[in-house]
Each structure stands twice: as C-alpha cells, then as structure tokens.
Amino acid sequence: MEKLFHLKENHTDVKTEVMAGITTFMTMAYILAVNPSILSASGMDANAVLIATSLAAFVGTMCMALMANYPFALAPGMGLNAYFAYTVVLTMGYSWQMALLAVFVEGIVFIILSLTNVREAIFNAIPLTLKSAVSVGIGLFVAFVGLQNAKLIVNSDSTLLTYQHFKGETFHSVGVGALLALIGVLIIAVMLIKQVKGAILYGILITWVLGIVCELAGIYIPDPDAGMYSVIPTAFVSFDFSSLGKTFGQVFNLDFSNFNIVNFIVVMFAFLFVDLFDTLGTLIGVASKADMLDEDGKLPRIKGALLADAVATSVGAVLGTSTTTTYVESSSGVTVGGRTGLTATTTAVLFLLASIFSPLFLTIPSFATAPALIVVGFYMMGAVAKINFDDMTDAIPAFLTILVMPLAYSISEGIAIGIISWTLINVLTGKAKEKKITPLMYVLTVLFILKYIFL
C-alpha cells in the first residue's frame, strides 16, 4: 500500500484515505440516480445506464488512482449528459448510438491531446491568479448546486431564483427536506469546528437517518413529482446485469443514413470543449484546495490525471453513457484529508459495489448530500486570499471568473470569460510583456471568442 500510494510522503494514512474515499462517493452517489433519468429521455434503457454509469465511474476513478495517484474521482458528467439527451438526440435528431460515437471519438482525441502534452500545456499556461479564481468559482458553483439539491433555492418566474417557502402543501415533502438539509449543514459545521474526523460523511449519514425517522413518523412524505423520494431502503442488492447488453457496444452499431459530417464535428467539438475545460477547472480547483500545486502553479503528474480522464470517456461511451469526467465533488474527500490514489481507489470500489447495492445507494436523498456540497463550497472559498486585489489587471478577470461560474452554471464558461478578460485587459493596458502572456493564452483567447461567435 505504501509503495503504491506513498502515504507517508503525502502525510496521510489508510484510515484517512478510506474515509475520504467514502465521503467523495457519498457526495457523488446522486449521479447513479440522475444520469439514468436524464439519458433515458433519449431512449436509452435506464437500468442499463445505471450499470454503465457505475462501471464507467469505477474504470475512470481507478485509472486516476493508478496513473496519477490523486484523490480525484470520475463519473459521467452533469450538464454533458443533458446536452447529450436533450440537444444532440431530442433536438438535433441524432440517435443515441450516434451521440455515443461522438463521445467515443472525443475521448480518442483527448487521449492524443494528453499524450502530446497539449492539455498539460493549457493547464500550465493559465496564470496563478486565475487558478485561484477558478477554485473560488467552483466553490460557489458547488455550494449553489448543494442549495438547489436541497431545494433551499428554487426557480422563480419573477426573480429567476428565490428561497424555499416553508408553508403550503409542499411542506411535508420539499419543505421538510430543505429543513433537514439546513440541519445537516449545522451538524457538519459543529463537527468540523470540534475537529471530528469524517465530519462530512457523518453529516450525510446522520441527515439520512433523520430523514428516515421523519418519514416513519409521517413528518416527511415522499412526492416523486417534486423530486422527493422515499428515503427508506426497500431492497439492498440486485444481481441483474442483463440490461447492460442494451447499451454495451452500441456505439459501434450505427445507422449512417442520416449522417451529417459537419453537424457531427460540431457535436463532437462541443463535448470536447466542455469536457476539456471542466476537467482543467476541476483539477485546478481541487488541487489548489489540497495545496497540490507547486510554486509555479503546476500540478505534478498532470499527464496521468488527464490521460485517465480521456480513457474513461471512451470506455464510458462503449459501456453506454455520456462523457465521463473528473468530478468537483472530489473536493469533499480532499476536505477530510484525502491526498492519494487510495482515496480514489476507495471511491472506485464503492462505485463498483453500487452496481450490486444500487437499491440501497439510490435511497440516499439529495437533501442528505447537499449539506456536504455547501460546506465544501465554503472550504474552497479560502483560495480568494491568494488573489492580488491590488492589481486590477488580475483582480477584475478573477472576479469575472468567480462570478460567471455559478451564474452561468458552468465551470468552463467561467474559465473562458476569465481567460478572455485577463488577456484583453493586460494587452489593452500595455502589461502584456510584464505579465509574460504566453502564445497559448492568445490562442485560447481567440478560440473562446470564436466559440461565442459561432457556437
């Protein structure tokens, strides 16, 4: 174990790493329920997608552990799965098999880019100030996702968003869930202040147990139409894997009769773009939080991390799921001390077990995992202290990066706005030479501008 993961060198131990891996899994487990729900809208079998999701997460996260020795976990990405189902299939009219082909090709392109150091060069070209801003922006993004998952922040026709009202007919479902999420935040906060190891994991489990008690007492009433399901497990294991055959290998079973090469390239590039910068943003944010970046702001062994992400995407497409990517929820495990691939290995094994214990894992409610995301968001805000607000050419792009991520609901959009604004502001103020803007930053700026014009 020591030879494989270098625990002493990273100032950690087996217990801490395992606890961190469990914590990461618990905050990511929702993807096992959400991904099948989204991709089934494209005509894919929900049970097959669930198994493919758990297997893709296992393969990707194990690759991360063994190729890079980092505590980062992978799974089919949110946002990309919605683009897959609702845009590529339902709007553009492609079959889900063709959409899987686009994901598969994207993964192959990523493997090539990773082996040729292109992705690593992009990572290293981003200035340290923007890397800190990305960490803060991701923190706000994660906290916002947590507030949404808890139903504490909901849609509003008049103000776009508003807080959850605790009166009315939805109180015993959405309202109680939101209150339990608030209690969960308090539980985690108190345990963190008391320096209880595994506070985030315990917070998730305690909130889940409170939900079970409330449901048994009739205080919490499930309402599937509102996304509030029963939190009491009705079964623990399922050994039926036959449904995987409905998606496995279907990426190569295609009908090219309505194939349009231009549209296909656009779709593939869209997957490529979002996955590339979401992954880079996540690696920057989580690694920054764990103090894994060196003094130049570079991430050691990044090639292995990027290659693991690329391999996972192509493998996931063959299994039958949308783009597999590095998850920002990995920061929850890092927050409780995860520093090596042993954390990722633990998470990977749990995803593999999830394919068997899916009935149990799928009952973990979103209001139990939401507090973890909110607290992780708080932790990631600490990177704001690394931003030099005395230098406006750094501070304004950093601010825009932080602002756009949660409001645009996109890590990649925040990075795009940050890079464009940082380059243009420094050029227009005559500080291009002083800031040593690399040619790659100019290229990225032009590409991002073209993306907003044509895509």
Listing of model-derived features with the role each one plays in the protein:
Residues 92-209, 345-455:
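Membrane-embedded alpha-helical modules
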Residues 18, 38, 122, 198, ...:
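Residue-level signature of catalytic and energy-coupling elements of molecular machines
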Residues 60-73, 189-192, 270-278, 309-319, ...:
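Transmembrane alpha-helix interface/packing and boundary motifs in multi-pass membrane proteins
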Residues 1-35, 56, 77-86, 90-138, ...:
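Helix-loop-helix junctions within the multi-pass membrane cores of secondary transporters/permeases
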Residues 46-47, 72, 96, 411:
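Membrane-helix interface/capping residues of multi-pass secondary transporters
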Residues 1-48, 164-167, 204, 208-302, ...:
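Helix-loop-helix hairpins and the membrane-proximal interhelical loops
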Residues 43-62:
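Loop-to-helix transition at the N-terminal end of transmembrane alpha-helices
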Residues 11, 15, 183, 265-269, ...:
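Alpha-helical membrane-protein architecture signal
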